[in-house]
Amino acid sequence: MLAVTTAALALAIGGCNKTDNTNSSAPDQPAQAAKAAGDQTISAALDKNGRFYQAAHSAGLDSTLAGPGPYTVLVPKDDAFSKVDGALKDAANPENRAELTRVLTYHILPGTVLIEDLGKAVDNGKGKALVQTMNGQTLTATKDGAKVVLTDAVGNKATIVDGDQKRSNGVVQYVDTVLMPAAASKAPAKS
């Protein structure tokens, strides 16, 4: 089922770059809608004093975000971190690294996914689209008017509030909520 969902999203997003001008007075130009591409990687462009970068650094993901990509990173605004507890509030604690990594990789999508791509995938999916994350779980994308909203595994809703910030290895989408994956399953205790 997950493979079908991933394939469907890939097809939906892949078809988003086709231009249909039948009901438009101007051509569809996603490149104009996106902010100018920077020559910095995602990691280099993030605020080093920001909560997401600090958490990514603690989890060892800053080197991944400096890698070739492409990635789409859903970066929660700093004030969103005040709403969560657990591994993210105590990101520097080495005991929380595995959980922190699991949560942060839930904020990374493979490939470059623009807001327009998500919106079209939602439209093509009759109101919603499942989006695969790097940790193997999915987010559900919907729309609230013109804004794209992502719902996590526990029901939290994050709106993309500032996005399509292109970098040399992908794109950054800023969201207003920290997204939480489904609880990790624990291996049964050995007797």
Predicted feature residues:
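Mature, structured domains of secreted/extracytosolic soluble proteins
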Residues: L2-T5, C16-S191
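C-terminal motif of bacterial Sec signal peptides marking the signal peptidase cleavage site
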Residues: L11-G15
